[in-house]
Amino acid sequence: MCAGFYVAVHPWLEAQSLHKVGHTGNLAARLHDGSYTTCFTDEWKYCFTLETSTKKDAQKIEAGVLYCAQFFRVKNKELVCLLPEKIKQLAEDVANCLDISYTLCDSPAYEMNDSTIVVEPSLPSDPLISKEKLRHLVITPVEDEEHFADDVLFFSTDETRTAIEDRLYQKEAANMGYQELRRSGRAILQMACRCGKTRVAYLILSNYLQGKVLYLVPGLSLLRQTLEKLYQYGISLKNVLLVGSDQTRIVLNHDNIEMTTNPVFIAKRIREAPSLLVIATYQSSTLLVDDFDLIISDECHRICGEWETRPFTHVLLNFKKGHRLFLTATPRYDTPLSMKNRELFGGVAFRYYLREGIEAGYVNDFELQMVAAPKLAHQPSTKEETTKQIIVKQIIMALAHLKTNITAPKMLVFTRDIKQAKELYAELVDQGVYALIAHSTLPRQVILKTFTEFCSSKEPVILLNCRLFQEGVEVPELNAVFFAAPRHSPRDIIQSICRPLNKQVQKPHATIFLPLEVNTENVCLDRFSSIIPFADALASEDPRFYEHLLNPSEVAYPINWIGAHGSVSELLQLARHAIRYGTQGKIDRLTRSERLPWKAAFAELKRTVEICCRYPKINDGFHFGGATLRFDTWYKWVIKSYLQYKNKEPSSLEPYQVSDLESLQDWTTRGVGGPYPWEESMAFLETWLAQNKGELVAIDIHQGGWIGLDATPMERLSGVLTTVSQRDGRSYGKNKKLRPKKGFMIPPQQAQDLDRIFGKHNLKWRKDRVNGFLKEDEHGNYTGEPTCIQEAYRTFKEYVKTNPDYIEKYWPGYAKGKHKHQELPHIWEKGLAPPRYKAFKDGNKQLIQRSPKKKDVKN
């Protein structure tokens, strides 16, 4: 006899998505005793068993599973409304926590004979287990919503197939992703929903098809969808293995294939095949072996969470071989195991914004509608009831708004939890609204029926849910989403926003409704706090929204307000102010360097380099979305972050941003090192003095050389020696008017270089001092012996008048004002240079265009 814990299923229960949980001392006989055969037909079968050494151990596992699945248990019955894979993982976790040894058997068939029929001794009905040990395993309805949706909506979506096309950005994404894989072995592709991540993955995995590739997806529905797409792209089923718990044969044209969860067959196929593509669910990943050249993790934000081994993290934490490619629209950075971990995930090799997909025509556009809090005719007795009544009215207002343009609109309502969904549903139905509800505690067939009714409805309808339809569910006719409770996770927000953004012919723009506890009588910044996380998430995906927040008069955005009786423009202005400065209204949250949209800021940097032939000056300005910014602040942040990245330190930059920077001319030398490189200039100085008999000849220390990328060695040396001359004698004090200039600000190593090079030729480069103070008159003019640098500058000024050919040879363009303006003459004359940033004492900022005056224009 074999004791064990089991999960059994019967067709009558399966129709309601119910599974029988139990324990026995005799697995071979259990399904044949009276409790199973009296009221049921003989169609019982095991989904799986955990064979144990004693019946008592099996009973403990059962008790633990029922405790952890309490929210999904039929009252007073050992019936659980969870998928078998979910129960299996839970049972194994319970056994491990209770230190019970077991052997897992999938779909076992035990041989029945007369010797197996024995009367089992009874055990206490409530075995002693440590619930404290198991508390972290308890499955809450909210937590299970996403995992339930992975498989429950398996037959509910029909994606329209379009002709295969390689969009330009997909080719770029595939190239950058593959290059990053070759460089570091790991890469993230962050691409907006509905922009073709699977196609990009196919282009990349095509480079690995001579070996073994693993493609992980979160659920059976996406497994089928991924297989269909890859087959459409040209993958042959001969070298494909599907690992998942659905036994339905998949037919593709004249080909067909089945999934498997047989661990022996899976391991043998992977180890023996010279080339193989395995498509598996994360839930079945524990059946795989570590022998892949490339592992693709789709919807990889689902991996993130607690730092523990579970099906979604099994491959990430335990497999050592192969390159890793991670695909997501919404990286997750707010959990202990997060995508900030570069060692595990790598960095973002390519990013494609939601706004880019909209403007390219691949994603439907949308509008934002904030919904004011209506007045209630009768004030409820509790705050909770008041909030519920307000949200119900706001939902009705939102649906009415949709009906003004759409005959039969469909709206998804996302709630805080299942409890709130049930309460809102009951209230809406009482008020005559056509409302539906779906959540993970309902049987699968009920959810599918509800979802089908929602999709096919010819009347205005809303569907309430918590997270069941937050991602991965396609409703082509969906028109709007309504946030009945604030969302704080950027991932949750963006995934929810994307639900109605399917692109269809003649489909109107979608609407995102944000209810607020604001009306014309209670306007204050605190009332807008709930939309700040939403705005932050949207601004990171939509640069146009970011620009609108900075200056709505210059950058329009489809955002409005319904249910407001006062000035809509004033309410929107307050909302924008709260988003930008916070509810305290003190700090500009949007103009920090790390918040500037990368593409816009980098485009200005690239323009400066390619058009102006230089890197930014310290006083360059930047006009973005109506904001006046000092570009040098962002530029210094970029250099600092770049050096951190190259030194393998924590950095704000992603690989695609590093690639952008390194594509610029002379980035590592002039961009990072600056226009006046010390070592390079010292080498030139040493050679120059040797060739000119120890004479510096002429040097310009007035206009500081030339910062352009095409600068001559003499122009760069001029810049270096300008800095030396300025620092020689500079005071350490903050208030220079009150302290004598006695400091020496040249770094010791640089001073040693100058002593060595000038000393060879007995040249004096330091200014004279008395008791540490510079020799100066009462007006602060230097009165000591001139240095060789000062003498060379006098010669330079003479040569400007008497030897223009010499000046043009070593300082080309000097006569045309290049050095005066620190811009190429044609750039200056055409006004193409970045504006000059100027800050005033009163806090105002101004950008002054660098443009020529008449006397500056050279004929």
UniProtKB/Swiss-Prot annotation:
The keyword ATP-binding applies. It comes from the Viruses. Its EC number is 3.6.4.-. InterPro entries: Helicase/UvrB_N (IPR006935), Helicase_ATP-bd (IPR014001), Helicase_C-like (IPR001650), Helicase_Restrict-Modif_Enz (IPR050742), P-loop_NTPase (IPR027417), Phage_T5_Orf172_DNA-bd (IPR018306). A motif (DEAH box) lies at residues 298-301. ATP binds at residues 191-198. Keywords: ATP-binding, Helicase, Hydrolase, Nucleotide-binding. Residues 178-349 form the Helicase ATP-binding domain. Residues 401-553 form the Helicase C-terminal domain. One of its GO terms (molecular function) is ATP binding. The keyword Nucleotide-binding applies. Belongs to the asfivirus helicase A859L family. This is Probable helicase A859L. It comes from African swine fever virus (isolate Warthog/Namibia/Wart80/1980) (ASFV).
